[in-house]
Amino acid sequence: MSQETRRVIEQYARSHDPQCFAEDAEFTQVALLNPIEGRDAIADMLRLFYQEAFSDARGDLRHVAADTGQDLGFIEFTFHGQHTGDLMGIPATGRTVDIAMLGVYEIRDGLIRRCRLYYDMATLLRQLGQLPAN
C-alpha cells in the first residue's frame, strides 16, 4: 500500500473530517444506493451521522489494505453508537448499535475521491428495533 493512501485513509477513519475528501468527491452508502456528491454534502452527511443520529459514534478499525497499483484503500471496521437523533426518518431510540462495515476508498492527490461504504441495512434496522430480531 502506498504510504500516502494509508495515511489519508487512516486520518479519515480517526477524524471523519470532510477535508479528507476532494471538492468533487462522491460518497455512496451502498445500502442506500444514492451517492452523495461534493465535499459540502458529504460534510452534512457526516455531521448528521456522527454528531446527531449517533452522538457518541466511533469506529473500531480492524484491517486496512490497499491496491497499490490503483490507489485504492480498504478499511474493515465496526461502527458503534447510541441512536440519539433522527436517522432516515427513524426518531432516536436510545438503542446501541454495533455494525460491521467495509469502506472502499479511491485516493487521488492526497484526498479521497470516491468512497463506497458497505454494511447490512437489515442488521442496522434490527438493532434500532425497526425489524423483528429473526
Place the predicted regions along the sequence by residue:
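C-terminal and inter-domain tail/linker signature
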Residues: 1-134
